[in-house]
């Protein structure tokens, strides 16, 4: 099974890339998609999200029967979850209005432009990086063998730039994101 977080789908500009996992043939039989609107609409921390569990997503039980994951998910949500507060639901609904979608695209455009400027600067300096296209983040290796937290401190103190240390992403974390 594939669990697909579509938090960054609104940053995708390449028309050949899928914005939903369900744009890929066969995904309804093997994938669940969720999105919090944290990146699309700045809803970080509000606990407003959606989850798509297709009716086609079924599993075989040990006794040879089938089990609908869609039905199990619905049962779980109805039993354990009291719902998102009304004020957050109202704000979430506004995201999907014409005006809300326009405002979201304006904000995303701001982040895209920041990524473009950072990428342009890194290219001019000859610094190899990844990201910045179809994503708001740019990742590059820390210089001179510095650890990512050490480079984070250096950037903050010397350039007043805040990045994300790669150490939190595993053992190959000698990278930083800006």
Named regions from a protein language model:
Residues 1-178:
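PLP-dependent class I/II
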């Amino acid at each position: 099974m594939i669990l697909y977080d579509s938090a960054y789908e609104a940053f995708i500009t390449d028309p050949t890339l899928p914005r939903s996992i369900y744009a890929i043939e066969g995904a309804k039989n093997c994938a669940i998609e969720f999105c919090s609107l944290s990146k699309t609409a700045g809803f970080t921390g509000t606990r407003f999200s959606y989850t798509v569990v297709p009716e086609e997503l079924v599993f075989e039980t040990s006794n040879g029967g089938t089990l609908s994951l869609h039905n199990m998910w619905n049962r779980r949500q109805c039993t354990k979850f009291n719902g998102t507060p009304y004020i957050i639901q109202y704000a979430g609904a506004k995201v999907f209005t014409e005006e809300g979608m326009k405002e979201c695209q304006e904000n995303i455009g701001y982040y895209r432009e920041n990524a473009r400027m950072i990428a342009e600067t890194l290219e001019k300096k000859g610094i190899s990086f990844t990201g910045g296209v179809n994503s708001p983040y740019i990742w590059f290796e820390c210089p001179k063998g510095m650890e990512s937290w050490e480079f984070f401190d250096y950037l903050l103190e010397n350039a007043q730039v805040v990045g994300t240390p790669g150490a939190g992403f595993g053992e190959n974390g000698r990278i930083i994101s800006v």
